[in-house]
């Protein structure tokens, strides 16, 4: 009987090609993950009152707050603005990572939340 129990050797020699493609995809994905560390996302909320800079790996690098939005009598508004900006930066980082990875995987589904 042929290898793998299939006539003609199973995949007809394509198994080596599949393995090579999988290894290349893995290397490409590792490189893309490293590249995401160097890509930045900038988010502004409240008409520029709060600015956030984050990496494609969801690391917040900078938060800038305009002094005029710091009101000791309305701390809750400042907290809401910061929360909104951080969440938007994280959402954009996810979009960037998904976009970069889909370039490598060719849009293959089934890998959500991998990055």
Curated annotation (Swiss-Prot):
Cytoplasm as UniProt keyword: yes
Single Gene Ontology MF annotation: DNA binding
Gene3D superfamilies membership: Nucleoid-associated protein YbaB-like domain
Organism superkingdom: Bacteria
InterPro entries xrefs: YbaB-like_sf (IPR036894), YbaB/EbfC (IPR004401)
GO annotation, cellular component aspect: bacterial nucleoid; cytosol
Protein keywords: Cytoplasm, DNA-binding
Statement: the UniProt record of this protein carries the keyword DNA-binding: yes
Location of this chain's protein in the cell: Cytoplasm, Nucleoid
Subunit note: Homodimer.
Similarity-based family: Belongs to the YbaB/EbfC family.
Entry function: Binds to DNA and alters its conformation. May be involved in regulation of gene expression, nucleoid organization and DNA protection.
Protein name per UniProt: Nucleoid-associated protein Ccel_0243
């Amino acid at each position: 009987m042929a290898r793998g129990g299939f006539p003609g050797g199973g995949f007809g020699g394509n198994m080596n090609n599949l393995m090579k493609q999988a290894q290349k995809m893995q290397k490409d994905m590792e490189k893309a993950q490293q590249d995401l560390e160097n890509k930045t996302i900038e988010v502004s909320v409240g008409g520029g009152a709060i600015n956030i800079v984050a990496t494609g790996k969801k690391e917040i690098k900078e938060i800038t707050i305009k002094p005029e939005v710091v009101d000791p009598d309305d701390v809750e508004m400042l907290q809401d603005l910061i929360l909104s900006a951080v969440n938007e930066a994280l959402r954009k980082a996810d979009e960037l990572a998904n976009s970069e990875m889909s370039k490598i995987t060719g849009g293959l589904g089934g890998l959500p939340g991998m990055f």
